[in-house]
């Protein structure tokens, strides 16, 4: 795929000297990927959308070309039946150091208008950026991460002097609809240390995040005439659902939660004839708080059963959606980032994310926890979205140094 004409014209006007050779390479790759409409579908996540498969095929072709040009034996890439792209580059050292995994995602959000995406190259505060014409999203989330990962693969394959352990890459579908790890092959992708290229603010690395559960309770009512309700054992599902919601202390609600505090959030009710289902979000960082919330949920159900004996109660959903990566994070992951950042003169801020990441979804499926690295994206999930090439290059440099640091681990 070639540059869109308008992007080429603006790029030529800016001049290649406006950015480094690395940025030039990443710009070409990013614009190619951004021009592919790879929105995921929340209602029909599987099989993956045609645009995501197009992205997967474009990535595989690029990696195959890089492998063919290199002298690296044993490097492989494949697309799974479910649309995941896996890349493996074997270690080029004899040391038994940990394997390193890098993840990102193929899809872009369905929450904003996609379709005929027209990437435009521009400048902002002296940096080269890529934006849209304001009528569609750009897909910087996470085509910035994809571009950085592909550039890292090219560099490692073309520079055998860079010593490294086994490297594993996963380009995942359906992240923006919360399904990135649903069909991941943990036999193919199961690194000892994981980093996710999907962050926004420059220099920020997410070291922990919410654990997220979906907890849905159905209240099955029993109809009767109100005038004879007691004799006919009237079961009021609406009243029971209201009592269930009211059981949770106001202090446990999201509007009273900050920092590393979690919350219980009954956020939606659905009604089907006599039955009412309460849909609840449960979020926490610390396992001890999660155990407290478990007791609160069980207590709420027991209380409603006692107060409304004619209403049957069913827990219809109790799913772990994503997990705090800190639970299983490699003990030297933070040191790796700090050492790598120091070598390139970068100031890093470690944060606790009140949300989830691709790595958090993977952790919920049994993989080791992974930090999330900034990737040069801004104003994501909107038609104001843009990508900053200098910040993408900075993320690339940080990850390359992390790769070089791995052999020092035992």
Label each residue range with its predicted role.
Residues 1-7:
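Sec-dependent signal peptide recognition
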Residues 34, 272-274, 347-401, 406:
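Zn-dependent metallopeptidase/amidohydrolase metal-coordination segment
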Residues 94-162, 166, 171, 394:
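Active-site metal-coordination/substrate-binding segment of hydrolases
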Residues 121, 125-136, 174-295, 299-302, ...:
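Midchain, well-structured core segments that form catalytic/ion-binding scaffolds
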Residues 239-256, 263-265, 312, 320-374:
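Active-site-adjacent substrate-binding region
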């Amino acid at each position: 795929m070639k540059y869109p004409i308008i992007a080429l014209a603006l790029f030529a006007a800016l001049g290649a000297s406006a950015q480094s050779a690395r940025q030039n390479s990443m710009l070409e790759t990013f614009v190619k990927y951004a021009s592919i409409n790879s929105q995921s579908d929340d209602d029909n996540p599987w099989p993956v959308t045609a645009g995501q498969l197009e992205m997967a095929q474009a990535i595989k072709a690029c990696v195959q070309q890089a492998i063919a040009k290199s002298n690296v034996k044993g490097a492989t890439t494949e697309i799974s039946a479910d649309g995941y792209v896996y890349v493996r580059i074997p270690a080029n050292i004899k040391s038994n150091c940990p394997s390193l995994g890098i993840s990102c995602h193929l899809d872009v959000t369905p929450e904003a208008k996609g379709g005929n995406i027209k990437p435009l190259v521009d400048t902002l505060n002296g940096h080269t950026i890529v934006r849209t014409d304001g009528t569609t999203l750009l897909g910087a989330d996470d085509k910035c991460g994809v571009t950085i990962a592909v550039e890292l693969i090219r560099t490692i394959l073309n520079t055998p002097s860079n010593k490294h352990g086994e490297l594993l890459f996963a380009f995942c579908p359906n992240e923006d609809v919360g399904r990135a790890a649903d069909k991941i092959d943990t036999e193919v992708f199961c690194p000892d240390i994981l980093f996710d290229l999907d962050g926004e603010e420059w220099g920020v690395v997410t070291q922990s995040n919410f654990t997220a559960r979906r907890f849905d309770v159905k209240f099955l009512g029993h109809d009767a005439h109100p005038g004879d309700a007691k004799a006919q054992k009237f079961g009021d599902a609406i009243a029971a659902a209201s009592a269930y919601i009211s059981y949770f202390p106001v202090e446990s609600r999201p509007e009273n939660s900050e920092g590393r505090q979690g919350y219980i959030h009954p956020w939606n009710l659905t009604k089907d004839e006599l039955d009412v289902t309460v849909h609840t979000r449960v979020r926490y960082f610390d396992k001890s708080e999660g155990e407290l919330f478990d007791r609160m949920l069980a207590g709420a159900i027991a209380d409603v059963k006692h107060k409304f004996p004619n209403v049957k109660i069913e827990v219809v959903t109790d799913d772990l959606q994503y997990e705090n990566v800190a639970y299983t994070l490699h003990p030297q992951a933070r040191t790796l980032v700090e050492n790598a950042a120091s070598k390139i003169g970068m100031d890093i801020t470690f944060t606790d994310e009140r949300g989830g990441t691709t790595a958090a979804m993977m952790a919920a499926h049994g993989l080791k926890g992974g930090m999330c690295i900034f990737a040069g994206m801004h104003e994501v999930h909107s038609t104001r979205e843009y990508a900053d090439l200098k910040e993408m290059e900075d993320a690339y440099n940080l990850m390359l140094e992390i790769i070089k640091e791995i052999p020092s681990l035992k």
